[in-house]
Every structure is written in structure tokens, then in C-alpha cells.
UniProtKB/Swiss-Prot annotation:
Gene name for this UniProt entry: cysS
E.C. designation(s): 6.1.1.16
GO CC term, one of those recorded: cytoplasm
Record-given protein name: Cysteine--tRNA ligase
Native organism: Dictyoglomus turgidum (strain DSM 6724 / Z-1310)
Sequence similarity: Belongs to the class-I aminoacyl-tRNA synthetase family.
């Protein structure tokens, strides 16, 4: 079955034809490890995981590379400001190396909780300084660089189609809102390949180079590491839509200038997670982490399910109500799976074909989820066949349907004492006291349900409080 993907570079949905079938080289921009990933970041990684799973589902052999930006990402997202990791190190009174290691491991824990398949290759920027210098030397030899007082810059005026990814030409490209003005630049869009360490300042992360002591620019990192592990051109480059106007535009410019060939054949970008009227982001001060969701009683896979309810190229509005609905739907799926007999059976070919068509149509996960529920509700399909078909779907959905997680929530001792006190009041038919205790339990963040088997306590969500 043919697979179609929307290519940002050509602005159209295209039939996927890898450069060297059945092998696929895929590079995804990883985290800048100065803080916890927020759930907006994680939406992008879930989209990329779905893409990878769809490729595998279609029989491709995927080599997936993801970088870890542990140096060089400045607060402006381009060439000015403080290194985000060094800034955080000062704030937390730890070394930059400790900060990077701590948040790298936190990120890996998050993606494991979300059932995101790990890349085949993790590549840390600090392990590839020589590769960055070698690429800058190639660009220097070909006449694409110039020196300023604070670093070595790439001259974007020498690239006729600079800005093609964003659909703008050089004259119409203004420096992005998060790019600070540098009067020494030849063009506002020029970007740093190598930044010099400030005079009389000893940075924690700095290296010697042919141009002086300093550190790499953010954009050169992805160009050098993707080429090292995947060659050039490679098949697929992914990221968030915020990467299009600056980061990915600059990657293309320097990579294609260096090697005189396209960087990647297909460029895919995930839309923002929106909260209120703004996109979720650390710079906006409105971000939520996966741990925040867990503390409120949501399972990480409920967030994964929530992300599947919208197409990756559509903004997704985050609300607690929507997340609560996603969790309920996921738990219903788990309950159905537990009821189905674990017998050997073949999957339903009609439903599998519909599901396959949906995922191969530019990763149409909302439609794939709708087909999933049609199957669950179809009384004509035997339960053991439903189970086999859902397990087939889960190769892409990634919801752990074969092994539904046990939802365990620790209830504090003080809550259990209140439950016992309430049970005693109910036994004595002191309904007023029982109601007051129920309200007290609710105010402490838990709700109590009376069942024939006795009281059941669970953590309240923002919806049930």
C-alpha cells in the first residue's frame, strides 16, 4: 500500500519513495537539555514516533538518529544571548555538564513513559565538536563564511534559494522575533557557525578551534551529525513548525552549500500544542510537564492518546477536560482488551485495510482512532478477532494494549483514616457527618465512591474536583 506524507519543502502531499528502499534514514531534532520537556515538546516526539511506527508497519527498515543539544542553543534561538544550559547551571549552582546529564536522563524517562521508541543513535553535541569544526572548514574553504568580533558567521546572501523551506526569499525574510540584531552581520539572516567565548570569561563548555576558543552554533550541530550518521541526502528530517523559519532553514543552507546536494528529501513538521490563546512553551511561561499530569492522576499514555485525537499538522488545544476524556477512552479500550479471550486468531482484514489506509494518508491518526472504535463496537466481529486486530493496530498506536498498565495511585494514610471515620458515621446513620467527611476528602484532592464492595477512593482530576 502506498504511503503519502506532506512535505514542507514542496508544500504538498507526496508519495513516499525512499532513496534506497527498503532502508529509510530519519533525523529528528532532539531536546535542548536545560530543563524538563513540556508536553508541547512531547507532542512533537509523539508525532515523530507515529511516523516511525508507520514506516515500520509498511515494512521499511528505519535508521533513526536524534540529537541531544547540550551546548550552543542560545536564548535567542539564533546567535545572541546566553547559552541556555550555562544559564541554568548558574541558577541551579551545578555544572553545565551536570545540568545536561540530568535533563537528558529526565527526557529519556519521559519518552519511555509515553511508549516512544528510542532512536537507533543518540548523538550529543558535545561528543561531536570535531565534526562541527570540519564542516565549518569546508564552508570557509568554499567562501561561505566571514568573521566578526563574536564569531564565524554564514553569509546567507550567497545561497540563492535561502528561505525556500519557509517559502520566503532573502529580501522578504526578516530576522525572527527571537533573533537579536547584530550590527556586524552582513545580512540580518546570517547565523553563527562558531561563537567565541567572551573575553575574560571562562565558559564551562568551550573548545579550541582554528578561529579561537569558543563553542558551536546551534544549527551547525544538526547538519554535521545528520550527515555523519545518515549521509547526504537522507530521507526524512522532522521537527516542530517553530524550526521551519530559522533552525531548519539554516541547516539546509549550510548543508547544501557544503556538499552541493539536497540535505533531505522529505521535511515533516508537527504543529503546536496550544494552551489558552498561546502555544505552550517555556518562553511563554505556560508549560506543563509529564510529571505534572501524573501528579494530577493522569497516566502518560492518556496524553499519548490525547495527541492521537488531532492530526499532527493541526494545532491541538490542551484542556483538562479533553485530557480527562482521552483517559476515559483509553481506559475503556483497556477494559475491552481485558475482556477479550486470549486465543490465537487472525486479525480482521477489512478493518486492518481501513486502518492501514488511514495511517498511510499522511498519518491520519484521528481517522485511525475512529476505525479502532468502530471495530470495538462491531458485534459482527468475534472478540478474539477484535483482540488480534487491536494488537495489530497497536503497532502504530503504541498504547500498550497487549499489556495494559496497572493504574496504581498511592492514597495517603490520612485519607484512609477519614474514609474509615466516614464509614463509621454511615454505620451509625450520621449522614450529616458522613457528608462533611466526604467534602473534606474532596478538598484534599480525592473522591470517594460507594460501591456494594465498599468505598473506593481515587485521586481527583481537575474535572472531578
Amino acid at each position: 500500500m502506498e504511503l503519502y506524507l506532506y512535505n514542507t519543502l514542496t508544500r504538498r502531499k507526496e508519495k513516499f519513495e525512499p532513496l534506497n528502499p527498503p532502508y529509510v534514514g530519519m533525523y529528528t531534532c532532539g531536546p535542548t537539555v536545560y530543563n524538563y520537556a513540556h508536553i508541547g515538546n512531547l507532542r512533537t516526539y509523539i508525532f515523530e514516533d507515529i511516523l516511525k511506527r508507520v514506516l515500520l508497519y509498511n515494512g521499511y527498515i528505519v535508521k533513526h538518529v536524534m540529537n541531544i543539544t547540550d551546548v550552543g542553543h542560545l536564548t535567542s534561538d539564533a546567535d545572541e544571548g546566553e547559552d541556555k544550559i550555562e544559564r541554568e547551571a548558574k541558577k541551579e549552582r551545578r555544572t553545565a555538564w551536570e545540568i545536561a546529564e540530568f535533563y537528558t536522563e529526565a527526557f529519556k524517562r519521559d519518552i519511555k513513559k509515553l511508549n516512544i521508541l528510542e532512536p537507533d543513535i543518540w548523538c550529543k553535541a558535545t561528543d561531536h565538536i570535531k565534526d562541527f569544526i570540519d564542516l565549518i572548514l569546508i564552508l570557509e574553504k568554499k567562501g561561505y563564511t566571514y568573521k566578526t568580533s563574536d564569531g564565524i558567521y554564514f553569509d546567507t546572501s550567497k545561497v540563492p534559494d535561502y528561505g525556500k523551506l519557509a517559502g520566503q526569499d532573502l529580501e522578504n525574510l526578516l530576522p525572527g522575533a527571537r533573533v537579536e540584531y547584530n550590527p556586524e552581520k552582513k545580512n540580518p539572516t546570517d547565523f553563527a557557525l562558531w561563537k567565541f567565548s567572551p573575553k575574560d570569561v571562562k565558559r564551562q563548555m568551550e573548545w579550541d578551534s582554528p578561529w579561537g576558543i569558543g563553542f558551536p552554533g546551534w544549527h551547525i550541530e544538526c547538519s554535521a551529525m545528520s550527515t555523519k550518521y545518515l549521509g547526504q541526502p537522507f530521507d526524512i528530517h522532522c521537527g516542530g513548525i517553530d524550526h521551519i523559519p530559522i533552525h531548519h532553514t539554516n541547516e539546509i543552507a549550510q548543508s547544501e552549500a557544503a556538499y552541493d546536494k539536497p540535505m533531505a528529501k522529505y521535511w515533516l513538521h508537527g504543529e503546536f500544542l496550544v494552551m489558552g490563546e498561546k502555544r505552550m512553551g517555556k518562553s511563554e511561561g505556560n508549560f506543563i510537564t509529564l510529571s505534572d499530569l501524573e501528579e494530577k492522576g493522569y497516566h502518560p499514555l492518556s496524553y499519548r492518546y490525547f495527541c492521537l485525537t488531532a492530526h499532527y499538522r493541526s494545532p491541538l488545544r490542551f484542556t483538562w477536560t479533553a485530557l480527562e476524556s482521552a483517559q476515559r477512552a483509553l481506559f475503556r479500550l483497556y477494559e475491552n482488551m481485558k475482556r477479550y479471550p486470549q486465543e490465537n486468531a487472525s486479525y480482521d482484514k477489512k478493518y486492518e485495510e481501513e486502518f492501514h489506509k488511514a495511517i498511510n494518508d499522511d498519518l491520519d491518526m484521528p481517522k485511525a482512532l475512529a476505525i479502532t472504535w468502530e471495530l470495538v463496537k462491531d458485534d459482527q466481529v468475534p472478540p478474539e478477532v477484535k483482540r488480534a486486530t487491536l494488537l495489530q493496530f497497536d503497532k502504530v498506536l503504541g498504547l500498550s494494549l497487549n499489556n495494559p498498565p496497572e493504574i496504581k495511585i498511592e492514597i495517603p494514610e490520612e485519607i484512609w483514616k477519614l474514609v474509615e471515620e466516614r464509614e463509621l458515621a454511615r454505620k451509625n446513620k450520621d449522614w450529616e457527618k458522613a457528608d462533611k467527611i466526604r467534602e473534606e476528602i474532596r478538598n484534599k484532592g480525592y473522591i470517594i465512591e460507594d460501591t456494594p464492595q465498599g468505598p473506593r477512593v481515587k485521586k481527583a482530576t481537575p474535572l472531578t474536583k
